[in-house]
Amino acid sequence: MICVAIDAMGGDFGCEPIIEGTIDALKEREFTAFLVGDQAQMEKFVPKEFINRVKFIQSNEIFEMKEGATNVLRHKESSIYKAVELVRSGECQAVVSAGHSGATMSLATLRVGRLKNVARPPIATLMPTSTGTRTLLLDVGANVDCKAEHIFQFGVMGEAYAKEIMGIKEPKIGILSNGEEDGKGNEVTKEAFKLLKKMKNFVGNAEGSQIFDGSMDVIVCDGFVGNIALKSSEGVAHAMNKLIKKEVKKSPLAIAGAVLMKKVFKIVRKNTDYDEYGGAPLLGVKNCVIISHGKSTPKAIKNAIFQALKFSNSNINSVISNELEKFKNE
């Protein structure tokens, strides 16, 4: 049975929503949850009928958001450190944390370790599209300065994720650029373009709008650009939501129309809701590491755990290592 280490203290709202999400996941899937944090606090939120499916790991410290990422190596009593150590030791196959993302990445890379041939592990996230599908965007923040070789590797890892986790047999892969034409981009992306052409599913440059139109399954970029794209899209979605609500309230006719459109709004919200997938995997490290938002709801935590279970039951890491080895020898 898969064992998942859960950093119960890392989120912005304490352990309650994280444990609630864990219990919701236990209701639907078979796995053992290792809850890491203050046991006295955590026990309050675990129903008696689930006690046998949960293991408590005592942690006496919460790693603060104000800390530098690599400082976590000195905080061995922190919940995130202990959660990652459960994966490193082999007791758990996956870790889910809504805590300090930089600390989670540092621990995953330095303590769990990278897969063979992986230079830089990227964070991958699923972006909504107008077709109802998802575009995998990576890197969205792990590596702000990248070489062409790193971006090429992101393409290999993204393709593996699309095939093994998303179930897409022949995923279309693009590189984020300032135009679709082959000659567009900066020196790094142009060089990465040449390397990516070795992949049979590479289709070329992708403009920012193509993240959301469903024309590509995987889009790669460095973590600086990717994080800006991610945060910009979140900002636009939030602004549009506020604008629609503001305009609807101005007119009784608009309110009536909104009531009639309630089902449509619900579908749109579901397609664009972060809670539906719950977290972003850090690819290229041994085992599975899922990074969730600090403000994650119980639903987001539940779906992050589902991601971890699907990842742990797949062959994705073997595929990544084998594909990178193949390209290395070409």
Swiss-Prot record:
Q: Which reaction does it catalyse?
A: a fatty acyl-[ACP] + phosphate = an acyl phosphate + holo-[ACP]
Q: Name one GO cellular component term.
A: cytoplasm
Its taxonomic path starts at: Bacteria, Pseudomonadati, Campylobacterota, Epsilonproteobacteria, Campylobacterales
EC number per UniProt = 2.3.1.274
Q: What is this protein called?
A: Phosphate acyltransferase
Which pathway does the protein contribute to?
Lipid metabolism; phospholipid metabolism
Its job: Catalyzes the reversible formation of acyl-phosphate (acyl-PO(4)) from acyl-[acyl-carrier-protein] (acyl-ACP). This enzyme utilizes acyl-ACP as fatty acyl donor, but not acyl-CoA.
Q: Which GO terms describe its molecular function?
A: phosphate:acyl-[acyl carrier protein] acyltransferase activity
